[in-house]
Amino acid sequence: ATLLREERPELSLVYLPHLDYDPQKFGVSGSDMPRLVRELDAACIPLLDAAKEVGARVWIVSEYGHCDVSRPVYLNRALRLAGLLSARQGPFGEVLDTFGSRAFAVCDHQLAHIYVRDLADIPQVAEVISQVDGVGQVFRGEQKGDIGLDHERSGEIVALSEADSWFAYPYWLDDTLAPDFARTVDIHRKPGYDPCELFIDPTIRFPKSRIVSRLIRKKLGFRTLFDIIPLDAGLVKGSHGLYAADPDDRPILVGDGNAPASHLVMTDVRDILLEALLNQG
C-alpha cells in the first residue's frame, strides 16, 4: 500500500499467500477456509484503499485451485531403479548427476517434466514412468501439444499424476544418503518444487532451539544449514496442477472493463492486463 502511494508504479504485482500455504500443507478439507478468507480480506483492505486513492485499476488473478492428495509419487527413484538416473556420492550426501543421467524428472506438484538425454531412450523412459503407481497420463512428442507444453523448454516427456497423488522430487533410495540441502529451504538445488519446505520436521523435539543454535553458528561464521525440513513427503495433503473438471475449482480472473471471452487459457491473461495498462486513458 505504501509503495502504491509513494512510488506510483505503472504496474505492480502483489502476491497474497493466504489461500496457498495451508491448503498445500493440510489439503482443502483439512484447512480452515473461512478463517483464511477472512485473513485474505483483511490483507486486501489496505491495498484496495491505496489503489482507490491513487486511481489504480485492480485485477485479481488466481493461478490454481487446490485438491486433497494422499500419495507422493517418486519418479526419480523409479528412473534410478531402472538404471536411467545417476547420482554421485559427495561429501554432503548424494547429488543428482544430471549430465550423467539418461533421464531425470523435474517435479512441480501434479506435473513433471522428464528430460531424456538420448531421444532413442524416450520409449523406454515413457514405459518406466507410465508403470509407476500414481501416474495418470504420460505425454511425449506432439502429444504434449494437447496440454500446451510442446515447446523447446519442456521435457521430452511430460507426466500428470492421478487426482489423489503428486510428484515428489527425491532421487535417493535411502534417507541416510539424502543431500544436506534436502532438509533445508533450497529452491535452486532441488530438481523440483518441495512442499515439505512448508513444514518443520515433527521429529525434532525442540525446533526453536535448533533454529537459535543455527543462527548463532551462522553469526560466528561457521558453514551452517537450517536443517529443519522433513523428508517425509507423506505430510503433504494438498496439491494442484491437473485440469479441474468442476468450474468452481478452476482459477479465476476478476477485473473491470469489458469481460473477456470465457474459457481463457492462462497465457491470455498477460495480453488482457497489458491492454488495460496501455489503454487506461
Predicted regions and their residues:
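Extracellular/periplasmic catalytic domains that process cell-envelope and extracellular macromolecules
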Residues: 5-6, 150-153, 246-247
